[in-house]
Structures are given as C-alpha cells and as structure tokens.
Amino acid sequence: MIAFISDLHLGNIYANKKETEEHSYNALAKIEEKLLEYQPDLVLVGGDIFDKNKVSGKEIGVFIDFINKMNKNNIGVVSISGNHDGKYWLKESFDHAIPYILYKSGINPENGYEYYSFAGIYLKNSRDWKTLSMIEDKYDISIVGFSFYTKDRLPELYEYLSIIDREKSDYILLMHQSLKSLLPQDPAAIDLTIENYKYALFGHMHMKYYKDKIIVTPPPYSISLKEANTEKGFWLIDKKPVFVPIEDSRPFIKMAIDLDNPIEIKPNKNAILILDVYYRESQIDKLNLLKKTLSENFLYVKINPILKETSKIIVKKSENKEEIFKKYLKEDYDFFMELYEKFRDIKDPETIVQYLEFFYR
C-alpha cells in the first residue's frame, strides 16, 4: 500500500502574520498521525514540500523529522520537486531542487534512510534509473517520478515518458503538474500519451480528484481563502484509491454582519476571520471597537467595512422622489418604498433627504 500526499507548503505565511506558519507544521503532524495509523509501505510526496524561494533550516528540519518518523516505522518516503521547492536554486536543471539537495546531502538509502527523490531525467545510467531500481528491489513496485518542469522542457519530458512506457508496465507515475503548459491546474487537461501506467499522481492543482487512472491530491490545509471549505487529506492506494480526510489546520471563517443587527461571533484564536461589516457613518466608534475586540479573539482578522449610506446626498431640484429614494437607500430601496406615501405632499428634494436621514438614525 502506498500513500500519496502533496503540496505541504511548509513555512507558508498568510497575510504576513508569522504565527500562521504553524498551520503548515500542524497539518504535517496530522498527516503523520494518519500515516502511522494506516502503515503504508511508501509515502509519495508530489512536490511543493516547501513554500518560499529560500528554504529555512527549520523548514528543512521539519521535513527531515518527517522522513525519520516514517523510517522508524518502516515506511519509506519518495519525493519530487514542485515549483515552490527552492526556486532560488532551480535554474535550468531539475537537479537543483530541494529534494535532490537533501538526497545529495546524505538523506538517502546509502546512509541508512529510506528516502528517494527523482529529478526527472531518464538518461541511460542516470540517478533516476538507479533510484527506480532501488525502489523496485526494496518495495516490489515501480515508481517513476518527474520533478517540476518548465514549458520549454515539455518535448524532453514527453521523450522520457515514451522511454519509460516502452520499458515499464504497471508503474506509478508521480508528477507535480499537468502536462498542458497552459492549463497546469486543470485535471481534465492531463494528456499523458502513454498507456502502461497503473496510476498517474499529481499535486499542484490544490484539489481532490480521481477519475480512471488519474489522481490529484489536495494540500493538507487551506493555503488561501478560496481553498476554505474544500476537502483536505491524502490518498491511500492499494487495490483501489481511498481518500483519507484530515481536519483543516488553517480554518477560515467568512461572514457578514450589520451593525444595526449585530450577532455574536464565536472566538477562535487559531482561525482567520474575513468579515464584511455594514455600518453607518454614525457607527464609526462601534466599528473600531469591533475591530479591536475581534483582533484579540482571532489569529488574524480582515474587516471589509461597507458604508450603508453617506451623510450628505447631493440632489437636484429636478430629481423626482423615486430617483432620490434609489440614490439614498441603495439596496434598502425596495423596503423603504413602503415609506413612499409619507412623502406624497413633500415637494422639496432636500426635505425628503432630511426625512430619510431621520428614519436611518
């Protein structure tokens, strides 16, 4: 049995809030807990292990600790690079990606680790062929890995894929992104032009997907707001793929309130709160107090203030009552049309505005 995880983005920080970095480490800890429960033979990591161009010692240390924990429980680790994995070093060669650097630094089978990484260069007698053979000998399964590539190298990758497909059968293909350079995040755009693989595993797309032999695994936590409320977890692949869900380590809460009818917002010091607040100019102090209170009760708070009305509406003598209502009341127009009859005998537009301001206090 193998497990497929991807897009850990270790060290990711949301909105420059340093404390949010812990979300990535907590997510990996949850994955570790599940992996130790299910005890796969191998864990495949589909790239974007790290998040930033320059990877810190702490981030590398966290990943090495992960390898050690897996190895102590007789679980091997196989990884490729994603587009986030050491872009500072990733120039023209896959060999400069972080997983390969770890391998060359001694985190490899020759030094007692069950950790294997692929650059994605399948020349004769290349390290990738040797790595493939080592995994076959140890685990009786063929894993073919390709690290992140740029679109100018697509012809080279297709050539390697055709070589692999001629020489291997029933193998697991491990890649970071789709082969369509213009649609790298659309699983429907994957076009492998090969036949003999058992499963093709992809990361990068930040979604859960399984159709036919194509599997995409999501990140273990929400990297951004748009990923909130999407499934987090990883795949276990034995006789058939099974998805293992985990709780999101970076909870986002998005909601809207009206200061005229405020509601209680339950505190969560681990969560990121995105809040639309509808207010009037007379409620500025109330809005500021809300900001202060919420920032003490959430890890990070972003408030989008939405002014319900302006204090001074410029009207023309020529404007009729209905036009004034539309201008002043905006989205409340339909409701306040019920007041229209109250203004039947008032001719002056400014007087109408004064009445509206009175009703809005």
UniProtKB/Swiss-Prot annotation:
Residues the record lists as binding Mn(2+) 2: 48, 83, 176, 204
Keywords tagged on the record: DNA damage, DNA repair, Endonuclease, Exonuclease, Hydrolase, Manganese, Metal-binding, Nuclease
This protein's record includes keyword rRNA-binding: no
EC number per UniProt: 3.1.-.-
Residues where Mn(2+) 1 binds: 7, 9, 48, 206
Note accompanying the cofactor annotation: Binds 2 manganese ions per subunit.
Enzyme class: hydrolase
Cofactor list: Mn(2+)
Residues annotated as the enzyme's active site: 84 (proton donor)
GO MF term (any one): metal ion binding
Organism superkingdom: Archaea
Activity regulation (UniProt): Nuclease activity is regulated by Rad50.
GO biological process, one term: DNA repair
InterPro entries (UniProt xref): Calcineurin-like_PHP_ApaH (IPR004843), DNA_Repair-Maintenance_Comp (IPR050535), Metallo-depent_PP-like (IPR029052)
Function field: Part of the Rad50/Mre11 complex, which is involved in the early steps of DNA double-strand break (DSB) repair. The complex may facilitate opening of the processed DNA ends to aid in the recruitment of HerA and NurA. Mre11 binds to DSB ends and has both double-stranded 3'-5' exonuclease activity and single-stranded endonuclease activity.
Family designation: Belongs to the MRE11/RAD32 family.
Subunit: Homodimer. Forms a heterotetramer composed of two Mre11 subunits and two Rad50 subunits.
Name of this protein: DNA double-strand break repair protein Mre11
